[in-house]
């Protein structure tokens, strides 16, 4: 069994980037590589083909499978938690809806999830040469350690050597590295083989003394330092990344994406950010919509609750005014449902209010049902090919008003679709932007841009990390004789 766990000092430390780049670097060596994340907490997900229909996994693991040149499958992300509120998450197990968990009943439910997640790892390990597993958050969350099956709980199960990634751009990375190891039990410390520094800016010679001291103090090696790079873009899994997302270009047409509290699949607008004539911004105040050329209502895990938030902020009036002025509005999945006449959830699928009036811009009604739609649809819009993926409980009933649009309807300047990923299709995106904004086709290719970014990440990993040493580490048990750092776990 050959595998490696990429853990991190914190959330958003760079685990996903290192895992993705390492998958590409190892795939280039002719190895059959699979990514794996036992449990992902994200509302950014993707549908891939399963044995009996579509299955849902985290978007990051889908991209990592592309990096590994492997076919994405449910075993690569066996447990996906999709937060619907601060204390309640929808659980996807092996690609299928499993139920809901809250903070109060999580301890009881995770035993079954842990067993399924570790069985999925064992299945992959029997079919692939190398498994590059990604941890979640930090392995040193003292209050969560007893039931951990994602970080060192997985490493113990599979005997995985573990490398910890730290983001030096935030500061405090040496304390974070040392503290991560020192707060682990002796058994878990023995699994930590070393470190990777992420997002370093400046002269590596200035960092070298600190790395030598870290190796001396911990008895563990540093496997390399990834530089900060302005062109590193990947489908993200974490809403933390929204804080810095925009693609400012002077004189460009502005696309304002409403930053809903429970936003999901916000990668739907990444393709717009690729266009040279567009400036994509995330907005949470009505004033940000006033000068927008296109307003986007994205997907959400809690449609009715986020619609109430929209109204509480006055954003509903801003959207209505935008449409009344003849300027385009686009709703995707939950955002599409908000644009309709009414949303009904009589069975409490979303766990909140059972009914709400929509914005009334599209002649549709939405009813939530228990069964989740997981599909990979294809279609056309005015002779332009279109495709996407569907992940939703809402069933749309269109009225007589409106024209057809892929996965939805159009009424004048207002468009709605249930298809995520539709605008990753270059032909549909070009046609839509020409129709709505008069923006000429740029020739930009989103699939090529993603592949180029994955290759760039693979190049950076090859250049700045000791990939051969990491592969040797994955092929063997963790090094023997690693020193214990006090105090250990409380």
From Swiss-Prot:
Pfam families reported in the protein's UniProt record: CbiA, GATase_3
Biological pathway: Cofactor biosynthesis; adenosylcobalamin biosynthesis
GO BP field: cobalamin biosynthetic process
Active-site residue list: 333 (nucleophile), 420
Domain GATase cobBQ-type: 252-428
CDD domains: CobQ_N (cd05389), GATase1_CobQ (cd01750)
Keywords, comma-separated and alphabetical: Cobalamin biosynthesis, Glutamine amidotransferase
GO molecular function, one term: catalytic activity
Keyword tRNA-binding carried by entry: no
Gene3D superfamilies: 3.40.50.880, P-loop containing nucleotide triphosphate hydrolases
Domain of life: Bacteria
NCBIfam families: cobQ, PRK00784.1
Biological role stated in the UniProt entry: Catalyzes amidations at positions B, D, E, and G on adenosylcobyrinic A,C-diamide. NH(2) groups are provided by glutamine, and one molecule of ATP is hydrogenolyzed for each amidation.
Family recorded in the similarity comment: Belongs to the CobB/CobQ family. CobQ subfamily.
Protein name per its UniProtKB record: Cobyric acid synthase
Species, as recorded: Mycolicibacterium vanbaalenii (strain DSM 7251 / JCM 13017 / BCRC 16820 / KCTC 9966 / NRRL B-24157 / PYR-1)
Gene coding for it: cobQ
């Amino acid at each position: 069994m050959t595998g490696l766990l990429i853990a991190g000092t914190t959330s958003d430390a760079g685990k996903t980037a290192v895992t993705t780049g390492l998958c590409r670097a190892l795939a280039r060596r002719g190895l059959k590589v699979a990514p794996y994340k036992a449990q992902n907490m994200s509302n950014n997900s993707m549908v891939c083909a399963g044995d009996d229909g579509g299955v849902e996994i985290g978007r990051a693991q889908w991209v990592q499978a592309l990096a590994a040149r492997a076919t994405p499958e449910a075993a690569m992300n066996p447990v996906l938690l999709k937060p619907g509120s601060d204390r309640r998450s929808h659980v996807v197990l092996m690609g299928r809806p499993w139920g809901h968990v809250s903070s109060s009943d999580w301890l009881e439910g995770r035993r079954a999830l842990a067993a399924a997640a570790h069985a999925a790892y064992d299945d992959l390990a029997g079919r692939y040469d190398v498994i590059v597993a990604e941890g979640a958050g930090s392995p040193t969350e003292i209050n969560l350690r007893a039931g951990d099956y994602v970080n060192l709980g997985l490493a113990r199960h599979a005997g995985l050597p573990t490398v910890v990634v730290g983001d030096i751009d935030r500061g405090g990375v040496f304390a974070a590295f040392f503290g991560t190891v020192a707060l682990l039990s002796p058994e878990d410390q023995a699994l930590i083989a070393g470190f990777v520094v992420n997002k370093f800016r400046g002269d590596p010679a200035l960092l070298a003394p600190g790395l030598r001291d870290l190796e001396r103090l911990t008895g563990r090696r540093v496997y390399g330092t990834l530089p900060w790079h302005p062109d590193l873009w990947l489908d993200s899994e974490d809403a933390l990344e929204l804080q810095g997302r925009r693609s400012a270009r002077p004189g460009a047409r502005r696309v304002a994406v409403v930053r809903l509290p429970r936003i999901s699949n916000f990668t739907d607008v990444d393709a717009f950010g690729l266009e040279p004539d567009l400036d994509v911004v995330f907005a949470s105040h009505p004033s940000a919509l006033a000068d927008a050329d296109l307003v986007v209502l994205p997907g959400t895990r809690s449609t009715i609750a986020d619609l109430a938030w929209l109204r509480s902020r006055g954003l509903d009036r801003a959207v209505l005014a935008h449409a009344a002025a003849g300027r385009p509005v686009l709703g995707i999945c939950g955002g599409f449902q908000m644009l309709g006449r009414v949303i009904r959830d009589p069975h409490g699928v979303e766990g909140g209010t059972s009914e709400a009036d929509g914005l009334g811009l599209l002649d549709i009604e939405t009813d939530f049902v228990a069964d989740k739609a997981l599909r990979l649809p294809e279609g056309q819009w005015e002779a332009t090919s279109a495709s996407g993926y569907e992940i939703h409980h809402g069933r749309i009933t269109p009225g007589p008003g409106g024209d057809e649009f892929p996965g939805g309807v159009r009424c004048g300047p207002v468009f709605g679709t249930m298809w995520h990923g539709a605008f990753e299709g270059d032909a549909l995106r070009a046609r839509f932007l020409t129709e709505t904004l008069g923006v000429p086709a740029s020739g930009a290719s989103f699939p090529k841009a993603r592949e180029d970014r994955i290759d760039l990440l693979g190049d950076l990993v090859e250049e700045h990390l000791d990939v051969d040493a990491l592969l040797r580490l994955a092929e063997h048990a963790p090094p023997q004789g690693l020193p214990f750092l006090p105090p250990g776990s409380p």
